[in-house]
């Protein structure tokens, strides 16, 4: 079977009977064995849980589960409590993590745990466990160290979480400067869980007593622990998830997509299109511009995007409307010569979507490579000038000031409004011209996640220069606002969030 893991997060109350049974089978076959410390007759027996155990979890509206499937096979699950305390603080406690033996060390556990602990605006993240690797993952995901002295200051909050976790006995928590233990009445064979990290955490959290587990928590107010390698891994992971982040934008519900007809009016005039013109839509997303052209009778239409999910949506709309558009999955940084076009549209910040400046310039080169001589393109990019004027979070070099990014407020802007110009939620790196955001996605049928999104923004002079240096004559480059592309704004007008460029291939 090909390994193509698929993830999702749902409320436990939404688990089907089939999923409940799959969780039971996964746990019972892969969790471990009893130590026999509470009952010698159980020693060596597999620890098993019935489907009813998981069904009971569904009675608590604060219980969630993240699942990993490969086809129909459940590879892993992470159950967790997500609770808002009376003071409004959000907390997450992972109550169970299991991964199929045959699929361990492939990053499944980390992805599942990130869905529970990866939201940076929470007050506390934690679990009870005998597995040192899981404690290390908690520290890695939250950028903080598990410290018994800090845990001891928050026993009231932890007690409120214990009230919703049947196995956690808040009356038997032992925390001091050398230990952090909680009685869970659980007796797994601890020796088989030992690894190279075990002694490290025994020295910090204490020796695990019979029936107890480590109580491991980190908290929002703790100092963050920065590591260069970890930093690079976080940014690289987020870059790899860029496709997923853009595909999860609920574009049909976002206000900036309401002006499609007006935008196509502009494109038709700027490119002098006739019904026989061949048009390429680069970074088409759900295909709204290509669909509008098809609706108007244009027949020779092609649209590229790197997200199969967005293209599936676009194809469905085209089929429903009876439109013929050639949708293809392509990375627009690397378009090979083949079909040539009379006009290309590349709208809403496709150029600028990547951290590396050269990647964004590669899109410009790709456009030139598929555009007929004398053909025109219409491109929009995010306006760095307004971004810099309005920035309230800025550093000269984010790599030298990582805390600025780690402490940046998170939002669900991409999933909800698409307003990526809200200065409260972005950090400007003035040396690289990268704009960082922490984007959260929840309860959309996919894995709950927080990603660090970095986009490159251009000044008007910079985008003109980029096109002129790559084989184009720039015909116009204007500051514009939504729904008024034919009414350019003056420099300094804070309504001009986009720079709209029309260029002709030389």
Predicted feature descriptions by range:
Residues 1-20, 24-35, 118-236, 240:
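Terminal substrate-recognition subdomain of acyl/acetyltransferases
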Residues 30-94:
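A conserved beta-strand-loop-helix scaffold within acyl/acetyltransferase catalytic domains
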Residues 99, 105-117:
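Conserved acetyl-CoA-binding loop-helix of GNAT-fold acetyltransferases
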Residues 237-274:
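Conserved class I S-adenosyl-L-methionine
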Residues 290-334:
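Class I SAM-dependent methyltransferase SAM/SAH-binding core
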Residues 336-343:
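A short acidic, Gly/Pro-enriched loop at the edge of an enzyme's catalytic core
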Residues 361-373:
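A short glycine-rich, Lys/Arg-flanked "PGG" loop and its adjoining helix->strand segment in the class I
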Residues 378-466:
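SAM-dependent methyltransferase
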